């Protein structure tokens, strides 16, 4: 079985690791932060007010208005006009971690806002160019957040924190911007499909997009795994059937990180799945470069979702 010796198999099944250890070994590679939050002056008597001093990197969350400062490694592809459409703030999760959030106003009066849970080795600074481009092309605003231990979010990455982090983002999006669930599309990419599936299994929303999803942590590490063990991490395969919103699954047939079979298995298990997008020849990190990616998203959002609402 996957090249494991008898002694290794005995160790695995007689003294199984906890899900948190599996998750930490498989999933989390937070980069060095590519951004900080810089305070903006608050309006006050005489037209000026006190703002929090210094950039926000790792200190406790403070009230106030913030602007994002990107490092060169963020490689922002747009100009100041687009940067000014990005609003950033910090919220707190139920596990007491500070969670950095980003709201990108791509389209005035957009019908939908995408709550985007990004992939593994990136943070909000590296993703914001993609968010500007994606939102503009599919006609949606984009809301995203950094997981605990990513970017300027505090704490450390863990499976439990992933679930608390997306809960905090969901609540912030709903309360801060007054956006109702039927106007929110949950979008998860790679490891981001884990919090996305968990949230979507508990709350109804406009739709769900699973981009290069995994079935579970054990199935990534040991591809011959056929059942979900109690010590498995990220058990998307056990939760996807509970989603009551339309689900679009996208996967590359040559994915070298999370095998294409994961996307197929989730599609077969998901009763609310719509026509999937299997991108022939695409790997784990290049699906966005194929023309059918945007074409399928546009059709899903502009044609299929409205028809399901009528």
UniProtKB/Swiss-Prot annotation:
Keywords: Cell membrane, Cell projection, Endosome, Hydrolase, Lipoprotein, Membrane, Palmitate, Phosphoprotein, Postsynaptic cell membrane, Synapse. It catalyses: S-hexadecanoyl-L-cysteinyl-[protein] + H2O = L-cysteinyl-[protein] + hexadecanoate + H(+). Residues 38-61 are annotated as: Disordered. Palmitoylated on cysteine residues located in a cysteine cluster at the N-terminus which promotes membrane localization. Palmitoylation is required for post-synaptic localization and for depalmitoylating activity towards DLG4/PSD95. Coiled coil: none annotated. The modification Phosphoserine is found at residue 307. Expressed in brain (at protein level). Expressed in hippocampal neurons. It holds the Pfam family Hydrolase_4. It is found in: Cell membrane; Recycling endosome membrane; Cell projection, Dendritic spine; Postsynaptic density membrane. The active site is at 190 (charge relay system), 255 (charge relay system), 284 (charge relay system). The keyword Oxidoreductase does not apply. One of its GO terms (biological process) is regulation of postsynapse organization. Its EC number is 3.1.2.22. It is a lipid-anchor. The keyword Phosphoprotein applies. Hydrolyzes fatty acids from S-acylated cysteine residues in proteins. Has depalmitoylating activity towards NRAS. Has depalmitoylating activity towards DLG4/PSD95. May have depalmitoylating activity towards MAP6. Belongs to the AB hydrolase superfamily. ABHD17 family. This is Alpha/beta hydrolase domain-containing protein 17A.
